[in-house]
Every structure is written in C-alpha cells, then in structure tokens.
C-alpha cells in the first residue's frame, strides 16, 4: 500500500510522534494505522525505558484550589528541556495531574502515584505514553496538599516555574497573595527566627567570628560587628525579617502586626531546585540518544 502524506499526518495527530517514525511504522504495517499505533507503542515502551535515567531539570509547577478555598494542592512535574514544557502534550498532562491531585488530596507523592486516572489507567502508564510522545524522560517529582478550616489561603505562580501557597491566620486574599508573591521572590528559609536551627545559627556565627578577627579591630568592636551581622543574616533568611517587596520601608513582620494577622504556613516549589545536573561530554550525549 502506498504511504501517503495524508496517512502519515493522521498517524502523527494520534501519536504525536515525528514524521519519519510514523512513516516507518506505516511501511512496516502496510499502511494499517491501528497496527502502526500498536507497533509504535511497543517500540516506544523500549525507548522510554532508555530515557528513565535522564536528568529532568526543567518542568512546570501547578496549583489547584477548591471552590470553597479551603484546600489547595501544589505539584511539580519535570522534563529534560524547556522545549517540551511548552508543548501542548506536556501542559495537558500537567493540568490533568493537577485536577487529580485536588480530587484525591494525597498526603505524599507515593499515595498520589497510586491513584487511577478517570479512564482507569495508572499514572505510570500515562507517563510512559507521554515519554513516548515527547521523546524525553518525564518525572512527577512532588505533590503537597494544604488544608485550612479558618485560615486565608493565598497562592502565587511565577512563569509556571515557581509556585507558592500561604495561609494567613485571618485577613483577606489580596494580602495572602501579596505574601505568596513576596515568598516567590525572596525564598525565605522559614517564617520566624524561632524556627531557625541552632546548628545553622552557630555555624554562621562561627564564620562571622573568624571573618571579624581578621579585621584587626578591638574586641568590643568585633562583638558589635558579630551582633550586627547575625541580625542581618537572620532578617535575610526569615520571612518576618525581610523587607516587603512592595514596600521596602516595612518588614513582613511589621506588615502582619499592622494587619493584625500572622502567617501560619507557607510552601514554595521551584522547578528543578535541588536537582544536580550531570555533566556529560559530547560523545556521552550522543550515545545516550541511541
């Protein structure tokens, strides 16, 4: 049977694969689209397995919030390149997972990955099919469910790469969103100084002491220098100590006092944070594609 451009186009639309892959599959199955699909899925399962150890440092974050604004889920899904993250196939996959996360409100990633999709398929099967379509490894890295009875939820997402959820004790959604936006920009370690570990504080203090000794200044001056540097450090890593990004004349702590409320919780996801990208030489890169 003659393999026409129209036939190749139909197979591409159904499989989302490259033109040459579709043409080869149609030639191998004498132009039978259904058999070509089965063949491609079989071959792509093998190809997908080869992609599973590739580093996925790009991706998207997704936030979904319930109608009553008391439950919210935050999700990160990764790919190898930002080219794939912009594809309709990947975006649709992430959107589907976001809806499922809000529906099932999982407590951890393992629980989430065990949930069936609306068509009865497993998330893993859907992931393998996406890998086959886009030609890259895809990982569902993390998910978190946040619930509140009386708090005010604020959310903010920046360029689909940073997502933040906050809960205020009381107040309004605009303030909660402003705090989420601030956290997206500044990435604080925690809310208040009381939450910082003593080990972290002692380590920073030890560094400042050694640096100050080299100044050659009197001990009483050195002590003041250390106190000043520690205060600056604490303010820099705690949410309440940071200057508000929309008004640098006040801190988040003072802003909370002014609005008679408190930040009870926050979580921040940034695509690829904490993932170490392996360095490969050119030959390794080429061989990895085979």
Swiss-Prot record:
Q: Which Gene3D superfamilies match?
A: 1.10.286.20, DNA helicase RuvA subunit, C-terminal domain, Elongation factor Ts, dimerisation domain
Q: Which InterPro entries match?
A: EF-Ts_dimer_sf (IPR036402), Transl_elong_EFTs/EF1B (IPR001816), Transl_elong_EFTs/EF1B_dimer (IPR014039), Transl_elong_Ts_CS (IPR018101), UBA-like_sf (IPR009060)
Q: Quick check: keyword Flavoprotein in the entry?
A: no
Keyword terms: Cytoplasm, Elongation factor, Protein biosynthesis
Q: Where is the signal peptide?
A: none
State any GO CC term.
Answer: cytoplasm
* Superkingdom field: Bacteria
The family database entries (Pfam families) matched by this protein are listed as: EF_TS
Q: Which SUPFAM superfamilies match?
A: Elongation factor Ts (EF-Ts), dimerisation domain (SSF54713), UBA-like (SSF46934)
Where does the record place the region Involved in Mg(2+) ion dislocation from EF-Tu? 81-84
User: In the UniProt record, does the keyword Cytoplasm occur?
Assistant: yes
Task: State a single Gene Ontology molecular function.
Answer: translation elongation factor activity
Recorded coiled-coil stretches: none
The cellular location(s) given in this protein's UniProt record come to: Cytoplasm
Role played: Associates with the EF-Tu.GDP complex and induces the exchange of GDP to GTP. It remains bound to the aminoacyl-tRNA.EF-Tu.GTP complex up to the GTP hydrolysis stage on the ribosome.
Q: Which family does it belong to?
A: Belongs to the EF-Ts family.
The protein here is known as Elongation factor Ts
Q: Which organism is it from?
A: Vesicomyosocius okutanii subsp. Calyptogena okutanii (strain HA)
Please name the taxonomic classification of the source: Bacteria, Pseudomonadati, Pseudomonadota, Gammaproteobacteria, Candidatus Pseudothioglobaceae
**Gene that this sequence comes from:** tsf
């Amino acid at each position: 049977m003659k393999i026409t451009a129209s036939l190749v186009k139909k197979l591409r639309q159904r499989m989302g694969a490259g033109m040459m892959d579709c043409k080869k599959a149609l030639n191998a199955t004498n132009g039978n689209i259904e058999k070509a699909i089965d063949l491609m899925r079989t071959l792509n399962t093998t190809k997908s397995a080869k992609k599973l150890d590739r580093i996925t440092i790009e991706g998207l974050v997704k936030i979904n919030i319930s109608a009553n604004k008391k439950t919210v889920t935050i999700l990160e899904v990764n790919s190898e390149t930002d080219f794939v993250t912009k594809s309709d196939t990947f975006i649709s996959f992430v959107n589907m997972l976001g809806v499922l996360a809000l529906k099932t409100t999982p407590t951890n990633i393992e629980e989430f990955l065990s949930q069936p999709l609306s068509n009865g398929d497993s998330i893993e099967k859907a992931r393998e099919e996406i890998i086959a379509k886009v030609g890259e490894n895809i990982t569902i890295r993390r998910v978190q469910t946040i619930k509140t009875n009386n708090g005010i939820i604020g959310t903010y997402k920046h360029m689909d790469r940073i997502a933040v959820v906050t809960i205020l004790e009381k107040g309004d959604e605009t303030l909660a969103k402003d705090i989420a936006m601030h956290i997206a920009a500044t990435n604080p370690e925690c809310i208040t100084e009381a939450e910082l570990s003593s080990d972290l504080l002692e380590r920073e203090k030890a560094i400042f002491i050694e640096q100050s000794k080299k100044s050659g200044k009197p001990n009483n001056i050195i002590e003041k220098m250390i106190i000043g540097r520690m205060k600056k450090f604490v303010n820099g890593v705690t949410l309440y100590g940071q200057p508000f990004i929309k008004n640098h004349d006040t801190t988040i702590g003072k802003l909370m006092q002014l609005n008679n409320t408190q930040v009870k919780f926050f979580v921040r996801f940034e695509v690829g944070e904490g993932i170490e990208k392996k360095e490969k030489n050119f030959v390794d890169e080429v061989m990895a594609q085979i």
